Amino acid sequence: MEISNKTIEELKKAGWYEGRKIDISKNVKFLEERGFEVFESAKKFMEEFGELQINVEKIWSDGSKAISEHTTCIKEVIGMLDSSFFSLEDFIDDKVIPVGALYDLEIDLYISESERLFKSTGWVGDNALEALDNIILEKGTVIWDKFEG
């Protein structure tokens, strides 16, 4: 899948670069202490895309501007909550873990054990870059009652 230049630009502004691999040991410990199983796809995502603040400016047809704030800063996403507050098991047959929050912390972002990403409202991408491209470009989400897989 080809990723848009806008998505690459927004990710780079947030501190991402190709081959990025940050130390996630404190975040893994933080998550495990709260009852989360931190599987390999989540670790891989956090190493490359963790601890980013992605602020995307949108210009409306009337010329006004709005900023969509997205974060992959795990402690900001989880806060004082534990794993019992984050689940998609009613919607998919795959383990998930929260790895971000979208639209000013209004919607959680999850990664599954199979590397697919989901918003709390539905599927958003089959891999991290596809999901981030869909989020940054505000492409549609496949809502739960239509999701298969």
Show where each model-derived region lies.
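Short hydrophobic/aromatic-rich beta-strand segments that constitute the beta-sheet cores
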Residues: 117-120
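Compact, glycine/acidic-enriched structural inserts
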Residues: 125-149
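A surface-exposed partner-binding patch
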Residues: 1-105, 149
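Short acidic-glycine loop/turn motifs at beta-strand connectors
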Residues: 111-115
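Short, surface-exposed beta-strand/loop "edge" segments at domain boundaries and coil↔beta transitions
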Residues: 105-110, 122-132
